Amino acid sequence: MARCIPSACSKALLGASLLLGPAQANPWQQARFPVPQFSGYTSHYGLRTGASGGSSLHRGLDIAAPLGSPVLSWWAGRVERLINDGSCGIGVAIRSGPYEHLYCHLQGTIEQDTLRSGGASLRQGSWLRTGEPLGAIGVSGRSSGPHLHWGVKLNERWLDPVLLLRAMADARRVETPISQARP
């Protein structure tokens, strides 16, 4: 598993600043949690045991939310590919510099090279801003209930999305003025 401590990931992000937008003192402030209406995490990154008893590497974080809830782009980037298969179901992969972020189990359809989900319409090569809706929570593919499977690669290596969420939370804590901090 690739480690993504804030300093290491920040360097990778700053190195891709032309694609990702203007550099900031803390680039993690630009990132956005992909499921604003989430209700919990149902499966974490790492080894897990399946119903058949075998173990496999789960390359992402499963985020439960009500069916049809919006899914947002974690970071600005280009749609690299649209996915429609038995595992991911309806999904999209977005390229943001050294990062590829994957969104699976979306509601909707892919027809004529266009993903239509939750009011969003995406084609390969489309540009998305950080926080822009890219689809809606669904149950497509291998899914036992409504959720988003969110996978992230850094320089083509899978990493634990929880590390990104921690870096985002740390960035926001650093920037919260003391007068706004809760006791």
Spans of features found by a protein language model:
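Bacterial N-terminal signal peptides that target proteins for export
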Residues: 2-13
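Histidine-centered catalytic micro-motifs
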Residues: 145-152
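Bacterial N-terminal signal peptides
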Residues: 11-21
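Short histidine-centered loop motifs in beta-beta connectors
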Residues: 72, 82, 98-131
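Short peripheral tails and domain-boundary helices/loops at the edges of structured domains
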Residues: 153-174
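Surface-exposed, glycine-biased beta-strand/turn segments
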Residues: 23-91, 96-97, 129-130, 139, ...
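Conserved beta-strand positions that form and line the central face of beta-propeller blades
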Residues: 62, 93, 102-105, 136, ...
